[in-house]
Design a protein with these regions (language model features):
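Short functional hotspots at interaction and active-site rims
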Residues: 1-158
Length: 158
């Protein structure tokens, strides 16, 4: 990822070399709880229903506790057959956000911070990008998560 903005001394243009071309796809799936990122997974493909079901089954569901509430947006992969059943089997509840409502989705702010960190780190290879993603995910603190939930209007408790 490349930085979108920068600063330069007055009267001078900012310039930075940026690679151009087509790159392999690297997708990170994750869930945000008040305690921070829970269950992150990186795959070398776009997210489809099969990838998302594998993420739920092998990564997220083992971390869910009875009484947890899983809130999802309306991405088509979130609505494939089997998603609701997996989450309910964990004892959690599944809620979908209204269409076009990123203001109610705290993970949107989390991804924004992660993308800022990735742009700053300027990883240019797949291996470096995976390390940068790990570093960016580790930078998400419980304080960040709690603030994002509060900003989106969700009550949080200690």
């Amino acid at each position: 990822m490349t930085r979108l903005r920068g600063r330069a001394p007055r009267g001078r243009r900012i310039a930075e070399a940026t690679p151009q071309g087509h790159w392999q796809v690297l997708t990170t799936l994750g869930a945000l709880a008040v305690r921070g990122i829970v269950g992150a997974m990186t795959v070398e493909s776009a997210t489809d229903g099969d990838v998302f079901l594998a993420y739920l089954e092998h990564v997220l569901c083992p971390q869910l506790q009875p009484g947890d509430v899983v809130v999802m947006d309306n991405l088509s992969a979130h609505k494939v057959e089997g998603v609701r059943e997996l989450i309910i089997a964990c004892g959690a509840e599944l809620l979908y956000l209204p269409p076009y409502s990123p203001d109610f989705n705290p993970i949107e702010q989390c991804w924004s911070k992660i993308k800022l960190i990735l742009r700053t780190l300027k990883a240019r290879s797949a291996e470096a990008l995976e390390q940068a993603v790990t570093q960016a995910l580790a930078a998400i603190t419980p304080e960040n998560a709690r603030a994002w939930f509060t900003h989106c209007g969700y009550g949080t408790h200690n």
